[in-house]
């Protein structure tokens, strides 16, 4: 049975601690407190609320914007997905309906998870066929995990099955033989392994190649960030932490290049787990979500 955050909507604060806004929003923060198939760490259902609460401690000034958020734009944190549905497919369809509401609002939606298994549901509600840009420790290309084809470990495979055009993934460092074979054989999958982009001697050149590859993407893009794509020292409380990952600045630069060069229509930040002894994981996730907001607003200014 899927785990839905017991926090419910009354515990949800507003992103960055900003006051509620009237009228149409420019950016929507949409929490999806969903956990069904997390392998190792538990608690991703509580992640969105923890991330939003932590965002109240994030500085509002953005050096590229040259001003504090919301920078004259309207940021709204909407009510979380309700979790209705008795089966996994009903849950995913419900996430799709929830996502469709956010897309149809005309605002830029940022979905907060919850486990990475939310992604196929989000794309069911997306009005356009998208190319995925994925930051992750795991390829998420398994055909199934423990008999479940919609496990978090299958999120990208199912998203491709359900119509995503392609995936460009970076930070990958934990995957199985079946996934390795698929990466080699499927022309829709472009993988930049952590061992290459983080290589102490040659990683810099490979990283620049990754950034250049993003500039070649045509059409709508959905950015999906599993925070375990970052090094485990930055996100110790996540669904499946893995050492050897990206730095915060790698993620920051990826977001900049994407929004400067591509038609990014939505994003998600997922696999956030609240941690009692240190807020580092949720604060890192909050900073990433805030970076996405800033990059999107900057792209509006430059239109």
What label would you give each PLM region?
Residues 85-88, 92-95, 183-196, 274-297:
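Short, electropositive alpha-helical surface patch
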Residues 1-8, 12, 301-302:
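Single conserved hydrophobic/aromatic residue that forms the stacking wall/gate
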Residues 87-160:
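Active-site pocket-lining segments that scaffold enzyme catalytic pockets across diverse folds
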Residues 166-236:
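Active-site rim beta-loop-alpha module in soluble metabolic enzymes
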Residues 145-148, 237-244:
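Short glycine-enriched, charge-decorated loop/helix-capping segments at active-site entrances
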Residues 21-111, 116-119, 173-175:
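N-terminal catalytic or cofactor-binding beta/alpha core of small enzyme domains
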Residues 134, 241-256:
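Gly/Ser/Thr-rich active-site loops/lids in small-molecule metabolic enzymes
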Residues 30, 114, 135, 170, ...:
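Active-site flanking residues adjacent to catalytic metal/cofactor-binding acidic residues
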